[in-house]
Amino acid sequence: MKHLFKLDPAKNLPHNSVTRLIHSGTDGFIIGGTDNLQTEAVENLYELLAETDLPIFLEVSDESMILPEAEHFLIPVVLNTENSKWTHGLHKELIKEMGEFIPWKRVTSEGYVILNKDAKVAQLTEAKTDLTEEDIIAYARLAENIFRLPIFYIEYSGMYGNPEVAKKVSAALDDTKFWYGGGIRSKEQAAEMAEYADTIIVGNIIYEDIEKALETTTVFAKKTV
């Protein structure tokens, strides 16, 4: 997967955009958000995407994001927080309550590093965002070599990140996949981050300018003679 659209169930999609997003050339969708999450809204959004055979990932930030019919679940582990609630605390409580019924083969964990101090998700998780490049690379190596996480996700959440950081993170990882999300608002930015990240995540621009959002998939289009 090179490209994923991230959809927030608490936001209204632009009119007639779902079919265009599905047929844009993206590799799949993440459904996830930070606040005002309701199971009904998650179900409605999931059903809107039902016509696609592309993977739909539910990013489980609370219980409202859990739909039994979903095929793929992403479990965020926030690495750059000192509040254990977001590294394993909530996870343990959910497993304690539902562990017997969790479809583990459909679950993928992702190591998150949140780097925009003004983002809601940074404030919610008490993320320490004033990190050096060395800090970020250390988190990448921690995710891969200590926690054995399959995904390392740098999240700038609405702000475009530093391509040089992405380049160094990419070089530090061998097997763990590097996902980048945050502030991609043009095909040029998509191409720049895609040079280093295994997967780029495009979110906010969907709600701001659907045409520019759709253009971000074109950087992966196969060239024909």
Curated annotation (Swiss-Prot):
Its cofactor is Mg(2+). Pathway: Membrane lipid metabolism; glycerophospholipid metabolism. Its EC number is 2.5.1.n9. The keyword Flavoprotein does not apply. GO terms for biological process: glycerophospholipid biosynthetic process. InterPro entries: GGGP/HepGP_synthase_I, GGGP/HepGP_synthase_sf, GGGP_HepGP_synthase. Keywords: Lipid biosynthesis, Lipid metabolism, Magnesium, Metal-binding, Phospholipid biosynthesis, Phospholipid metabolism, Transferase. Belongs to the GGGP/HepGP synthase family. Group I subfamily. NCBIfam families: GGGP-family, PRK04169.1-3. This is Heptaprenylglyceryl phosphate synthase. It comes from Listeria welshimeri serovar 6b (strain ATCC 35897 / DSM 20650 / CCUG 15529 / CIP 8149 / NCTC 11857 / SLCC 5334 / V8). The gene is pcrB.
